[in-house]
Amino acid sequence: GFDNAKYLQMQSQHIRERIAQFDNKLYLEFGGKLFDDYHASRVLPGFEPDSKLQMLLQLKEQAEIVIVISAQDIISSKVRGDYGITYDLDVLRLIDAFQGMGLFVGSVCVTMYTAAPEVEAFEHKLNSVGVRTFRHYKIPGYPNDVARIVSDEGYGKNDYIETQRPLVVITAPGPGSGKMATCLSQLY
């Protein structure tokens, strides 16, 4: 079967090596569920439902979490099917859960930013409790118009997310939130 302890040790070591390889800054897109990945534990016997979280906890002194959420998901009040809560409320739940485990949440990035009262209220709520917010904008032609994407009209328009730690974990309440685009924008 799957050796969970060996997995945690090897993955953590590999991430440390990557951080050193990339000038002490690594952006790591974390998709899927961090707290309760029962699907992975079903298809991979021996994989614990919280293995990803346990790996992060081994790196917590180096790690900073950035949570991304699409403006459209805020505006439409998109609901997580598993928890029955909206994505914006899930961001608040994730912040509390990460902080409760001793992990540092550096900021929240609103992706595909659109000015709307719901988005402004969400940003205000986060700022009022000390969570910094950043904005990434819609890029016409994304993902096919590479020349525009990697220009001042593309990633260059986005806020640069100021981070403090060498491992920046980009996560989100659900798929399609812009995790990978956020990583790429930071590199730009």
Task: List the predicted regions and their residue ranges.
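Glycine-rich phosphate-binding P-loop
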Residues: 167-187
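Short, glycine/acidic-rich beta->alpha junctions
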Residues: 48, 118, 162, 178-182
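Pre-Walker A adenine-sensing motif
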Residues: 13-17, 151-163
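N-terminal pre-Walker A segment at the start of P-loop NTPase domains
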Residues: 136-156
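Glycine-rich phosphate-binding loop of ATP-dependent small-molecule kinases
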Residues: 1, 158, 188
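Pre-Walker A (Motif I) flank of P-loop NTPase domains
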Residues: 24, 164-168
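Long, basic/Gly/Ser/Thr-rich N-terminal segments
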Residues: 1-141
